[in-house]
Curated annotation (Swiss-Prot):
It is found in: Cytoplasm. The gene is groES. Heptamer of 7 subunits arranged in a ring. Interacts with the chaperonin GroEL. One of its GO terms (molecular function) is ATP binding. It holds the Pfam family Cpn10. This is Co-chaperonin GroES. InterPro entries: Chaperonin_GroES, Chaperonin_GroES_sf, Chaprnonin_Cpn10_CS, GroES-like_sf. It comes from Chlamydia trachomatis serovar L2 (strain ATCC VR-902B / DSM 19102 / 434/Bu). Its main location: cytoplasm. Together with the chaperonin GroEL, plays an essential role in assisting protein folding. The GroEL-GroES system forms a nano-cage that allows encapsulation of the non-native substrate proteins and provides a physical environment optimized to promote and accelerate protein folding. GroES binds to the apical surface of the GroEL ring, thereby capping the opening of the GroEL channel. GO terms for biological process: chaperone cofactor-dependent protein refolding. The keyword Metal-binding does not apply. Belongs to the GroES chaperonin family. One of its GO terms (cellular component) is cytoplasm.
């Protein structure tokens, strides 16, 4: 678990992962300052913490396909959003991760 997740005391369960969406620029290309209501949700996020994992039919632990610190692509509307200490996070299932960005 990352230092950030440890200090927040958030531990996802099962095959869920905790991610933090990347911030969208607050200024448009033309220099116009965008209000929060005009910003769209980003589909890129950093993996902050991993859950305990999923088990197969024989009880063997299946490895996660991502690691803490990876930048992943998730659907804009997936997961459970939560705010902790003023920071916004999303808990998503591993199956909701579309890709790992290299």
């Amino acid at each position: 678990m990352s230092d950030q997740a440890t200090t927040l005391k958030i531990k996802p369960l099962g095959d869920r992962i905790l991610v933090k969406r990347e911030e969208e620029a607050s200024t448009a290309r033309g220099g116009i300052i965008l209000p929060d209501t005009a910003k769209k949700k980003q589909d890129r996020a950093e993996v902050v913490a991993l859950g305990t994992g999923k088990k197969d039919d024989k009880g063997q632990q299946l490895p996660f396909e991502v690691q803490v610190g990876d930048i992943v692509l998730i659907d804009k509307y997936s997961g459970q959003e939560l705010t902790v200490e003023g920071e916004e996070y999303v808990i998503v299932q591993m199956s909701e991760v579309i890709a790992v960005l290299q």
